[in-house]
Amino acid sequence: MKRKISISSLALILLFAVLLTVMSSCVLVDSELRNEYGDSIGSSGNSSGQPTKFDTIINLFKTYSYYEIDEEVLCDALVGGMGYAIGDRYADYYDAEEFALLTAENQGENQGIGVTVIENAEYKCIEIISVLPNSPALAAGVEPGDLIVYIGVGENKESVSELGYEGALKKLQGTKGTVCEFTVARGEGYAEQVEFSIMRDVFTSESVTYHVASTNSKVGVIKLIQFDLTTPQQFCTAMDSLIASGVEYFIFDVRYNPGGDLASITAVLSYMLNENDVLIKTRDRSGSEVVTKVGPVQYKPTDAYSACNVAKEDIAKYRDKVKGKSAVLTNGSTASAAELFTCALMDYDISEIVGTTTYGKGSMQSIFSLAYYGFDGAVKMTTKKYFPPVSEGYDGIGIKPDLEVELDKSLENKNIYKITDEEDNQLQAAIALIGK
């Protein structure tokens, strides 16, 4: 039976562990890091065997506090507090249920309402950057650009600014059959508030959609919604289908794509780059750099990551189809791994970039399961900065497109999935550019 994690043990784990990712580039951390850090992660006390300052403070609270001690709540607060203290706003703790949901989502199996979000620092709220197809949120009328300002509705609502981003995010998550209630601000000046009560459900994520452009039958449009473990296969299906239909040019739409799993983006880029091309460079706090190049990748058949296998014969299989005949559509909500996708295709002169400057997130968060140490849950923290193959890093800056085109103002509040090809002026600009 798994144990609930003690606060002192979590504190030590947080001091030494390096973890796996969400909403950015994802890494699965296992034996390699354990070999690097050894068993010191799971030990308690200091090198002399005496209680640490953490142990002492926690035991004082447990012994003398007037209030009941909920260790799960304290774990969450401890990680958040440590993240705040070191300037890591992405640090977090997941209990067993939350970690199970997160793992399922990364494999394309979702329970919830079906939105992808980022933190909006300006308004201290949660910004919805995309609403997934066939999701409860889409059916309820939630729109990209909505700002979640309250969790709950009516008199029971709580301000996101007071809960904090991670705290509010957890209240949005939940399992099938439970109700998610929140209030959004939208419209001009965000003056309009809309309340939602949405039943959470199970749905399979559609990380890639595609179609032949209605305005040009020689152009295929592939929308990459996020990079999860389903994306490589769905991307190949999209490419093969469009090629079979006679398409000669391609638009890769990563507007509102928040990023995803590093293994996923590595596989997708491998289909369009040459073997030994640099995919990504990562640097830890010591400045140590790791360079990942295109090459065959083989996971164990039982590993969920086997969906991201790359056979040698599949490397560069679409390169000749897309080089000089494709464009990437971006906007301010194109983030993290989606920016890496954009920058790699730009650095190797595969695609033109059209749209607006991207979000600018070049940091890697890792999530480390505590099961190895006999505990439930997982912890997350920023472990590395990552850099594109050739260009300078874009963290905090974003990637400027080759052709800057703002989305028509009349479309700003329209669901991205409901904008037609004829209406989409950014898409039309990309089609005109690659068709010259």
Name each model-derived stretch.
Residues 147-183, 233-236, 263-264, 361-372:
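PDZ domains, with a preference for the canonical peptide-binding region formed by the helix
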Residues 137-164, 250-253, 353-354:
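Conserved PDZ fold ligand-binding element
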Residues 108-153:
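Glycine-rich active-site/cofactor-binding loop and its immediate structural neighborhood
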Residues 101, 191-193, 204-208, 259-329, ...:
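Gly/Ser/Thr-rich loop/hinge elements
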Residues 51-105, 188-189:
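Interdomain regulatory linker/hinge segments that flank or connect interaction modules
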Residues 163-210, 382-383:
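PDZ-domain C-terminal substructure recognizer with occasional recognition of PDZ-binding tails
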Residues 88-127, 197:
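PDZ/PDZ-like peptide-tail recognition elements
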Residues 1-48, 54, 58, 75, ...:
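Gram-positive cell-envelope targeting signals
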